[in-house]
């Protein structure tokens, strides 16, 4: 089982509240098969037996924030 923690920080938003962007990023991974995730205050825990699925979920989350008009996104990913 592969576990990863991803923390996404939208930069240069019109508001200091990033919850809208984070919620949309999490929504983007809800239908990825063979992926389990858990939300906590510091990020989102991703779990899968396949590293490609972890990568797909991470990419989806980051691209979702970009598609919402945020050009700069700071991302921290820890993988175990």
Which residue stretches match the model-derived regions?
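Charge-rich, low-complexity N-terminal segments
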Residues: 1-80
């Amino acid at each position: 089982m592969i576990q990863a923690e991803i923390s996404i920080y939208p930069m240069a938003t019109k508001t200091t509240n990033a919850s809208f962007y984070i919620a949309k990023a999490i929504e983007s991974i809800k239908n990825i098969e063979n992926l389990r995730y858990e939300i906590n205050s510091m990020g989102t825990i991703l779990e899968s037996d396949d590293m490609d699925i972890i990568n797909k979920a991470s990419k989806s989350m980051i691209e979702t924030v970009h598609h919402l008009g945020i050009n700069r996104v700071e991302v921290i990913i820890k993988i175990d």
